[in-house]
Amino acid sequence: DFTNGKLYQTTTLPKGSYKLTVNFKEYGVKAGSSLYFAVAAGNEVPDVDDVESNSIAYHDFGTGENKTPSECVIEFEIKEDTQEVALGFVASFSANSWFRATGLKLELK
């Protein structure tokens, strides 16, 4: 088990509308576990309990399994001339939860 495991990267983005696509090979989120992909202002993604209130945008994977390739798309807007953001995963997993991401693509729309 672990709480608030994070895998993220920071970057500075110019003003604009963005589309972020996250590709997965598979994932399994067991009951009592949480998995998010978050875009947050600043230099770190928030903890699991704060993702929904402290993110510019996020995707909640809920609970369940998906053993086929899939993707999630997150759209968001940067309103400042430039803004530092953190993009990445945050999870609290009980035993036997997992995910395998295969790619991330950030596009300025």
What are the residue ranges of the model-derived segments?
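Exposed beta-strand face motif in extracellular beta-rich ectodomains
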Residues: Y18, Q83-L87
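Extracellular carbohydrate recognition and processing domains
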Residues: V45-T82, S94
